[in-house]
């Protein structure tokens, strides 16, 4: 995966990191939070300096930038790494935000469902009830996403402190 990601621009990798951190924000902060952040930086081949110099994007900017990714393996990796924290949190607002995110990306629904099923099996967790046709069109799901952006900032701060 690192080889595929290394072909992307640093900007695109920063947008992917932003998406991952939003969904990581649904999990409780614990001793693994810092480790997950460091793993994200490593696989995305980003440094503390890269993250500090990247302007914090809005949800719309994240979606607009990631939407154009066409590599199936990379899409699968993004869905797996955004869905697994949602599964672990067992929070309905997290699931609604994830479904809204998937809907906004406009990627193949069957591809997303297959990846979700694989992720559920990987983490040996029961699936949460989801229905792509009933994704809310209002801002309720998005507001949950925006509230997690604050957690994104906290995670970046933790990573920054840890890497100093």
Spans of model-derived segments:
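Small-residue-enriched hydrophobic alpha-helices in membranes
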Residues: 1-163
